[in-house]
Amino acid sequence: MPVGSDPTAFWLTPPSKYVVPEGNNPYGVAQSTDPNFEAPSSWRTAIALDMITQGGWDVTLEYNLDQVRQAVFFRDLGHYKKTTLADGRGVYGGRGDYNLTNTEEGATEAWTISAFKEFGDIKWYAGYTNMRATDIFELTSAQSESSYGRSVRADGENITAQRSNFMVEHKLISSLDYTTQLIGENDTRFSLVYVRKSGEPYSVTFDGYDDAFANSRSDGGYDAAYIPSGANDPNVVFASDAVASAVMAHVNSTGLSQYKGGIAPRNAFNSPWNSSLDLRITQDIDTGVGKVILYLDVTNILNLLNEDKGIIREYSNRSRQIILDEDNPYDSQGRYNIVGVDPDDGLYVYNKDGQSSYQWNLGFKYEF
């Protein structure tokens, strides 16, 4: 009995109604997992040395290493090379049949030194951390399509571990704490905390076109940018002399200059350094049956003193600074068609929770 007329299979569509997608159908995709796939894991090593000197200094040295054993890697089973551009970069296509597999690349290494000392009623602390972290995929999405497609790369699936999006290479923190009695025998405490750290890494990429060079199934804007060597770069066609002048002025005045004539690596650049200074003042008041604690928090004192300070300026994980022609990103000779430059693409002030503005908070609590 045909499926369409079988009353026990009423939910099935007759085979004659099925439609087999064509090879280029954007929805005819499949996803799979490598049968040998292993859950992400890493080898971790840590060593620390604590010292207390005769002068009362408490010093700590610490080293941490997190070496990838197995990490996540995505590939398109239909990935293929369509052509090669003048600079040697490949242009690729794909089917969107994403396969989840493993890579052994990636690591995180961190050094930390800290010191603590009491000077009577004053307590002082300072610590510095230097970190280097590398990975392949940012994994900022729960879907394979976006995890695969929203990863900055230079040549298709030929990817090596580069600096992580979320790495803070340098971080310095220092605190000062002073306790005295200004009202009878009740403690009055002043606490200052200062933090200074380097900005997170970001990539300079191309902009202005829809399909990525790395895979036509992916969105544009994630291809690491080729940096022209000059107005007469043989791998580039500028839309005009004015465009060439603007692009090269930007290149020569920034860190892009060290990559002239080549492709800027993923996360080769850092957002600006940022600093913060916070103050807390607490006053204890003894009630005989308990204690009232009044507190005043002043966060981002730097911004309070100067409106141009204490502001966190960051680039998103990619800055699409080199703009290609929307319809023809490269010509018949494989040369990039550059039509403009956007030096500040992706640069924004991070103030989601008030980090870039000062705040006052006054409150109290009662302890029985």
Cite the ranges covered by each PLM segment.
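Outer-membrane beta-barrel and related beta-rich outer-membrane complex signature
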Residues: 1, 27-28, 60, 69-80, ...
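Solvent-exposed loop/turn elements at secondary-structure boundaries
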Residues: 1-99, 235, 256, 261, ...
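Short sequence motifs at beta-strands and strand-loop junctions characteristic
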Residues: 27-29, 35-41, 102-107, 116, ...
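Hydrophobic, lipid-facing positions within transmembrane beta-strands of outer-membrane proteins
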Residues: 33, 43-47, 107-113, 170-176, ...
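Transmembrane beta-barrel domains of outer membrane proteins
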Residues: 50, 114-118, 177-179, 282-284, ...
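Gram-negative outer-membrane beta-barrel transporters
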Residues: 60-203
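Extracytoplasmic gating/loop element in the C-terminal half of outer-membrane beta-barrel translocons
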Residues: 189-288, 319-348
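Outer-membrane beta-barrel "beta-signal"
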Residues: 352-368
